[in-house]
């Protein structure tokens, strides 16, 4: 049986945690930052967890993590 291909886009965006979830970088921090408050930009720095309902789909895209 052939190997399953890893979705390369997903591999660059998600990392598996020790407890089996996935963490990802939050969006809205690339450009047009002048109108966003310092507090909002600081909070966007912290990693975000993938929602439990999406974990199965992400795990399917990353079979070897």
UniProtKB/Swiss-Prot annotation:
This is Large ribosomal subunit protein bL35. Keywords: Ribonucleoprotein, Ribosomal protein. NCBIfam families: rpmI_bact (TIGR00001). GO terms for molecular function: structural constituent of ribosome. The gene is rpmI. It comes from Methylococcus capsulatus (strain ATCC 33009 / NCIMB 11132 / Bath). It comes from the Bacteria. Residues 1-52 are annotated as: Disordered. The keyword Ribonucleoprotein applies. HAMAP family: Ribosomal_bL35. SUPFAM superfamilies: L35p-like. InterPro entries: Ribosomal_bL35, Ribosomal_bL35-like, Ribosomal_bL35_CS, Ribosomal_bL35_sf. Belongs to the bacterial ribosomal protein bL35 family. Residues 26-44 have a biased composition (Basic residues).
């Amino acid at each position: 049986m052939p190997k399953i291909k890893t979705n390369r886009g997903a591999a660059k965006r998600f990392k598996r945690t020790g407890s089996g979830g996935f963490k990802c970088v939050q969006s809205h921090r690339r450009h047009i930052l002048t109108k966003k408050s310092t507090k909002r930009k600081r909070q966007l720095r912290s990693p975000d967890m993938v929602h439990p309902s999406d974990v199965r789909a992400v795990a399917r895209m990353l079979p070897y993590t």
